[in-house]
């Protein structure tokens, strides 16, 4: 299997937290599925970017989690960070709405859709499912990624404190509701998804960007600079 699928590619802090997953039966089944898919179909993101979110934001540096669903399935869009696209790519509708809310909330205008600068500041941009077939949304759902990303969220809940979980949409809320059943020391911000179908039902006006920085400041932590240069 391609080296991009091995835990050795992850920061040591994630290796330590997730080491038990690699020996689980579901993981070997997922790897076999991915090997077949990458061999016979166009899959996003590129293999080397599957774990970009974990590489960009080590476990011990996570301050905020923004949970997405599955990667963008258009050409050149997905690069391993939820909601993000590489520099030079047109903004997908959900990201356009995210930036609209950011401007309304904090007066910040971003043109580039690459959210790497957020990830570098401790914002874990995690999709629930980490791969997808070109042009086929949710095509890799139910193959094991959900269990793996459950493990990521569970480790953060259990072994970190004062992480801010940002849940946009029912899928993110449902995922975390199952995992937040024990007492925890975290903050949760939830609202409808930023997609054009749902944004007007409460995403616009949620003020999550200023709320995140308010909570970080209250914790004595550095606030996120949401401006992308």
From Swiss-Prot:
Recorded catalytic activity of this chain's protein: Hydrolyzes single-stranded DNA or mismatched double-stranded DNA and polynucleotides, releasing free uracil
Gene3D superfamilies hit by this protein: Uracil-DNA glycosylase-like domain
Active site: 70
SMART domains: UDG, UreE_C
Keyword list, A-Z: Cytoplasm, DNA damage, DNA repair, Hydrolase
Pfam families: UDG (PF03167)
GO annotation terms (biological process): base-excision repair, AP site formation via deaminated base removal
Record-listed E.C. numbers: 3.2.2.27
InterPro entries: UDG_fam1, Ura-DNA_Glyclase_AS, Uracil-DNA_glycosylase-like, Uracil-DNA_glycosylase-like_sf
Subcellular location as annotated: Cytoplasm
GO cellular component, one term: cytoplasm
Any one GO molecular-function label of the UniProt entry: uracil DNA N-glycosylase activity
Protein's job: Excises uracil residues from the DNA which can arise as a result of misincorporation of dUMP residues by DNA polymerase or due to deamination of cytosine.
Similarity annotation: Belongs to the uracil-DNA glycosylase (UDG) superfamily. UNG family.
Protein name: Uracil-DNA glycosylase
């Amino acid at each position: 299997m391609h080296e991009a699928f091995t835990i050795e590619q992850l920061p040591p802090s994630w290796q330590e937290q997730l080491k038990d997953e690699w020996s689980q039966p579901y993981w070997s089944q997922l790897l076999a599925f991915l090997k077949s898919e990458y061999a016979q179909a166009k899959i996003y993101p590129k293999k080397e970017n599957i774990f970009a979110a974990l590489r960009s934001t080590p476990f011990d540096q996570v301050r905020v989690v923004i949970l997405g669903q599955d990667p963008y399935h258009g050409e050149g869009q997905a690069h391993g960070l939820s909601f993000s696209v590489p520099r030079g790519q047109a903004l997908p509708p959900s990201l356009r709405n995210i930036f609209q809310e950011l401007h309304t909330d904090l007066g910040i205008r971003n043109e580039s859709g690459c959210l790497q600068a957020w990830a570098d500041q401790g914002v874990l941009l995690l999709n629930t499912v980490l791969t997808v077939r070109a042009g086929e949304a949710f095509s890799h759902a139910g193959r094991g990624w959900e269990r793996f990303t459950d493990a990521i969220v569970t480790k953060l809940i259990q072994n970190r404190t004062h992480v801010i979980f940002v849940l946009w949409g029912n899928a993110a809320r449902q995922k975390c509701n199952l995992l937040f059943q024990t007492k925890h020391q975290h903050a949760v911000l939830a609202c409808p998804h930023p997609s054009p179908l749902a944004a007007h039902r409460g995403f616009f006006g949620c003020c999550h960007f200023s709320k995140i920085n308010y909570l970080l400041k209250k914790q004595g932590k550095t606030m996120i600079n949401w401006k992308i240069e």
